[in-house]
Amino acid sequence: MEKGHILIVEDEEKIARVLQLELEYEGYSVTIKHNGTEGLDAAAEGGYSLVLLDVMLPGLSGLEVLRRLRKTDSQTPVILLTARDSIPDKVTGLDIGANDYVTKPFEIEELLARIRAALRQNGTKTEDIGTFLTYDDLRVNEKTREVRRGDKEVELTPREFDLLVYMLKHPQQVLTREQILSSVWGFDYIGDTNVVDVYIRYIRKKLDYPYEKQLIHTIRGVGYAIKG
């Protein structure tokens, strides 16, 4: 049984490959990105159990990737990998949202133990890992179909839930009504695209209107987007 999906953001290909082989042997699935920009894009899409993030990356640094990721995802565990062993460096990484900090070179057994610990601390059983989608204070469990905004549970119909999940998988991206229709209702749907507007309104009544901060935005003449 797959234990979870781990994103490795590491510019040294040899290190990334070794980590991939070890993690896959342990039962994890692995995705690798070799620079900060690609790593941030992948992490922001969600669906990962944990992120292994090198600090010294081309493009965006690992710390900047983490800082930006934490603006939209406070849940996914992140372990920083770095050759810099000073206390100030560790404090900075932990303060901006890292769950742990591992100094290179490291023993793979220790890293695996830290990964297991981070997953436990995240309060997720390994068989359920990778089912959560988060944005700001909105949290969705795809497996149990539970939706929470802040500390309040929100009940959605099956269609409302599917629409919300689709939008959460494309955060800060403008989605046209046609895209939403084909992905949520199916390519064979025959009907008016206004059904999208109707269901967006249903979701807003439950997830946006009771709160000061609105997450679902109308892009006039185009469609909708989830953004802060």
Curated annotation (Swiss-Prot):
Pfam families: Response_reg (PF00072), Trans_reg_C (PF00486). Keywords: Cytoplasm, DNA-binding, Phosphoprotein, Transcription, Transcription regulation, Two-component regulatory system. SUPFAM superfamilies: CheY-like (SSF52172). Disulfide bonds: none annotated. Phosphorylated by YkoH. Residues 5-119 form the Response regulatory domain. The modification 4-aspartylphosphate is found at D54. GO terms for molecular function: phosphorelay response regulator activity; transcription cis-regulatory region binding. SMART domains: REC (SM00448), Trans_reg_C (SM00862). One of its GO terms (biological process) is regulation of DNA-templated transcription. InterPro entries: CheY-like_superfamily, OmpR/PhoB-type_DNA-bd, Sig_transdc_resp-reg_receiver, WalR-like, WH-like_DNA-bd_sf. Residues 130-228 bind DNA. GO terms for cellular component: cytosol; protein-DNA complex. It is found in: Cytoplasm. Probable member of the two-component regulatory system YkoH/YkoG. This is Uncharacterized transcriptional regulatory protein YkoG. It comes from Bacillus subtilis (strain 168). The gene is ykoG.
